[in-house]
Amino acid sequence: MSFADFLLIETVIYLFFALPACYSDVRKLLIPLRFVLLGFVVLTAAKLYLLHRYSANPRFFQHSMLNLLIAAATSALLYFCVRVFSAGGLGVGDIFFGVYTAVYCGFYKNLVAAAFAALSGILFYLAAAVAKKIRKRILEKSGQTEFVHRGIFVIPFVPFITFGAVLAVFLF
C-alpha cells in the first residue's frame, strides 16, 4: 500500500464526517458534536490500523502516534485560546472540529491548515462586509432602507477549517 493510498483513505474518512459538519455549521451555526466525535474515533482507529499494519519500523509507528497526540493537544490549545481571546467568537464545536482536523493533518500540516482557515475566513468576512456596504448604498440610492439592523455578522468557521486542512494536506 502506497502513501497515496493512505492519503486517499484518510481524506475520504475525514470528508465523510467533515462535509456534514460544514453543512450544519453553514445552515444552523451548530456543529453536531456526536458526529465529529464519531469521526474522530473512526479516523483515529483507521490511522492506528493502517500505520500498525503497514509500517515496517516500530519507531515510525511510535513517532506517528506521538505526532497525532501533539497535533490534537496543540490544536485544542490553539482553538481554545482563540475562543478566549475572541470573547466566544469561536464555538466549542469549532474546538472539537479542530482536534478532529489535527488527527487528519498531523502536527505541522495542522498549523498550516489553521493559518489557511484563518486567512480564508478573514477574506470571506471582508468580502461579505464589502457586499453588505454595497447593498446598503444601493438601497439608500433607491430610497429604500433596511428595516432590520444587524450587528456584526457571524460566519461559520468549520468550512474554512475543512478547506484549510485539505489544502494543507495536498500542498505540503
PLM features per residue range, with description:
Residues 1-172:
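A membrane-topology feature that recognizes alpha-helical transmembrane segments
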